[in-house]
Design a protein with these regions (language model features):
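Substrate/ligand-engaging "lid" and interaction regions
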Residues: 1-30, 34-273
Length: 273
């Protein structure tokens, strides 16, 4: 059962599903051999084991493999890193976006936000029907849009919030000062993306949707979790440095970037790893 946040009426009852023990290779390979579609949401660090579990499978069809992971080209990268050849398996990369808050361990019920987005790389093979959630497009542009605007705002607000003694993301939307910082940050990130891709039409709507999502208290988005892995997230090609470089080249406003940089220099952030 999946209950959408803020909407008691949107409840989906999921039935007729089953599971296979991962160490039961015979049953696992038999089930995979009959598949039309194989997807994952196991974390990018586990994708190699997923690929390796398919090496000896004799597929009856030509299934599509899509890794729904928060990583650049998760599907194709995992396949290349595995350094294997799997006959008939089609690989498609996807940019996925949905916030899943901490779940109860007392049942199989899952509560998620109502918003969801899957943008698959536009290829002749289309494993899903297009809908409000699913679309096909330019993978590179969609990945950068999410990385810079959504993940970039997430990172800036995490450090700004921790420096202001906040614990959860939604607490940054409780007063005018923090709301102003949030809006200024996302406006700068949106500007950076438009400098990267001037043809995009939906950036303003995208920004408003992100602010609405981040302000939802039901998500329980812990700032210390968002701030983790700073060596990766502040990398030159990542969500902070890459848009900042573009803004600097165009003499644009970088005030919120400067604020976060000062926080990094002056605050005691030893709890972040």
């Amino acid at each position: 059962m999946s209950n959408f946040l803020n909407s008691k009426e949107n409840t989906l009852i999921v039935e007729n599903f089953s599971g296979i023990e991962l160490n039961n290779l015979a049953d696992l390979e038999l089930s995979l051999s009959k598949a039309d579609l194989i997807t994952t949401s196991v974390g990018p660090n586990h994708l190699l084991s997923v690929i390796n579990s398919m090496v000896n499978v004799e597929f009856e069809k030509s299934p599509v493999f899509v890794a729904f992971e928060n990583k650049y080209r998760a599907s194709s990268t995992a396949y290349k890193e595995a350094n294997v050849e799997i006959d008939k398996l089609e690989i498609i990369d996807a940019v996925v976006d949905k916030i899943v808050p901490p779940q109860s361990t007392e049942s199989l019920d899952v509560t998620v936000e109502e918003f969801g987005s899957i943008v698959l790389e536009d290829q002749p093979i289309k494993p899903f029907k297009s809908s409000e959630v699913v679309s096909y497009g330019d993978y590179e542009k969609e990945f950068i849009k999410k990385l810079w605007i959504l993940n970039g705002l997430h990172l800036q607000l995490a450090y700004y919030g921790l420096a202001n003694n906040k614990k959860f993301m939604h607490e940054l939307f409780d007063d005018s000062k923090n709301i102003e910082f949030s809006k200024n940050a996302i406006n700068s990130l949106g500007e950076a993306y438009l400098l990267f891709d001037r043809a995009t039409k939906d950036v303003d709507d995208y920004k408003e949707t992100i602010l609405k999502r981040f302000s939802a208290p039901e998500v329980k988005d812990e700032l210390i979790r968002v701030a983790r892995n700073p060596l990766i997230k502040f990398n030159k090609s990542e969500r902070f440095q890459a848009p900042l470089d573009l803004l600097l080249k165009n003499s644009s406003n970088i005030e919120t970037f400067q604020s976060v940089f000062q926080i990094l220099l002056n605050e005691d952030l030893d709890d972040i790893d």
